[in-house]
């Protein structure tokens, strides 16, 4: 096992006042594998600017400018993140969503009616 020592000990990250985070399950549950580069960039931006509840609001024009993409690409990219289950969007609000225990559509197993109703009761689809 590799012993991890900081390469730049004087620059160890500290939790900032406006703390945001990326859930490790983004990688371990393969959500990131389902994202285009544009979607990963938009997700990183939204996670960075979100408040404690994952909420933010930026206009399509501003996001497109900040991410150097046209508005059509931004809309397609936003829809991609919604379909994957990483964000919710209702103009003008974005919400970075909690990552499900199992990625949506990745179980490959049948669900009982009880499981489906349980998920619906938790606000999942």
Residue ranges of each PLM-predicted region?
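Short recognition helix of helix-turn-helix/winged-helix DNA-binding domains
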Residues: 1-54
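Short, amphipathic alpha-helical interaction segments positioned at domain boundaries
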Residues: 102-125
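Charged/polar, solvent-exposed surface patches and flexible loops
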Residues: 24, 33, 65, 76, ...
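Intrinsically disordered, low-complexity N-terminal regions enriched in serine/proline/glycine
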Residues: 30, 42, 57, 88, ...
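Generic low-complexity, intrinsically disordered sequence content enriched
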Residues: 26, 46, 67, 85, ...
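Winged helix-turn-helix DNA-binding recognition segment
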Residues: 37, 49-102
